[in-house]
């Protein structure tokens, strides 16, 4: 007979400024082992509403990588990961964020196979596909007409249209859910005019400066890197671009403040995304997730810090396969 004390829900430590938010956390097909441990920890100690969906995609013609090119995953590995998330009753959103896909790649068999298996392993009914290309959305619908499709913000970044409420309404005719352009997420004069705000999603931890002048250039470069991963000059160009513009300057970060989150929520937005695209290590993703979920009230700060530290210690080894500067802060077995 177990003598462990019962686990009590910690509703009072979870931030309550977005009580009905539908959270989506990145890291799928990249940080899966630690992401599943995080989800188990959250389901044990936190209210069920905390996280209902993970996002991500394996490296393929339809996805992008910020730091070099990840090694390809086998079909068997992808199948196993989809099955594991289904077993955990967690929805999966395939994040196909490449906005510049070659016409012949729209029929990529691996990508279409992923979408097919995603729809077949969908016990929660929450599985979706997120694309950054109208052409890719059309290609997917030809094979999977019932697949719910989200419009990725990268489609808006590379688009030439003027982003007005009427433009967003046209996107509503094509997509089930639309990610707001990062600039529009901090422009109340625009998002308060949206007729169906519940059909929009917002990234909370966008790393790029608010007025980043080279967002389009960066996405175009990353798309070229996907097509030619062996071209080292492209990687050098990407490194030069990010260092030149101060992409990671925290004082200019596009992270949404609590007041900005509350304003979007009050307007009717309910879908909030914690992305992993710009993280080299899963530890950073986990820390961001806890920061966004846990209360910042002073009377709970010690409990919140203890829970976050306990979770990171519980997860232990963070296997950052890319240079990150976090080697001194790894959790390992004694």
Placement of each model-derived feature along the sequence:
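Active-site pocket-lining/capping segments in soluble small-molecule metabolic enzymes
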Residues: 2-167, 174-334
